[in-house]
Amino acid sequence: MAFDSAAEGYERARPDYPVELFDDLIRHTGVGSGDRVLEIGCGSGKATRPLADRGLRVTCVELGPRLVARARAALAEYPDVEVVHSSFEAWRPPDAVTFDLVVAATSWHWIDPGVRYRKTFDLLRPGGHLASWSAAHVFPHGGDPIFRELQDVYDEIGEGLPPDAACPRPGELPDLRGEIEATGLFDVVSVDQYDWEVVYDAEGYIRLLDTFSGHIAMAPWQRERLYAEIRRRLGERPDGLLRRGWGAVLHIARRRGA
C-alpha cells in the first residue's frame, strides 16, 4: 500500500481540512456528542481529530499498519476513538453495531465500488448519514505559475500530464451527486465545495509530493530530478515559496428506508 510507506510524512505534509467543512457536516447530519461515527481509511487521523473534538465516538478502519500506528499515537488522548487495522471491505462491526454517521475523507475513491455504498448502507442506522470528501488541487485564475512551469520536468522524466488533463478552478471540482442517487440507497442532502490555499517552501512541498501515490511510485532518479528542479526554481524566488490551491467537495447523503 503506497500511502502506508509515507505514514510519518502524511500527518505533517497533508493539509488540514477547513473548519467550515466540519461545521457544515455537523449541521447537515445533526450528529452530536456521543453519537457513533465510522471513519473509513482514517490515515494518520487528519479528519478524526476534528470529529473527536466535537464529542463524537469514532471507530476508524485503516488498512495500512504504519498509518494505524501513527493514528493510534496521534489520537491517544481521545478515549472514544478506536483505530482498527483492517480494510473496510473485510471489516465487520462487533455485535451488529450500527452507526449514526459514516465518514470517508480522501479515501472513498479507494474503496471497491461494488462494496462501498451497499456496505455503508448496512452499517448505518435508518436515517443515518454518509459524508465523503477528497482534497484535490485547484487552479485559481492568476494562481501560482510554477505548476504549469514544472510540467516540462514531468514530461522529461516521463510523468507528464495528458493534453486533456483537467485543471479545475475553485468551485469547479466534479461531484458524486449522480453516482450517489443512482445507488437507490441514499438521498443527497447537500453538496458543498470548500477552497483554500496553503503556502509551501521547497522542502514542505517535497514532503507533500512524497505522500502522493504517483510520486511514491516514481523511480528514485525521477524524484531526484524533479525535486532538484523544485528546489532550484523556488530558490530563485525572493521569498522561496509557492502557493497551492486546494479544494474539497463534501457530499452528505441520508440512508433510505426504515
Language model segments and positions:
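Conserved beta-strand/loop positions that form the S-adenosyl-L-methionine
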Residues: 40
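Short catalytic micro-motifs in class I SAM-dependent methyltransferases
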Residues: 106
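Conserved Class I S-adenosyl-L-methionine
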Residues: 44, 168-258
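A short, conserved alpha-helix within the catalytic core of class I
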Residues: 111-120
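Conserved catalytic/acceptor-binding region of the Class I
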Residues: 121-195
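Conserved class I S-adenosyl-L-methionine
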Residues: 1-35
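A short acidic, Gly/Pro-enriched loop at the edge of an enzyme's catalytic core
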Residues: 92-102
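Class I SAM-dependent methyltransferase SAM/SAH-binding core
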Residues: 36, 44-91
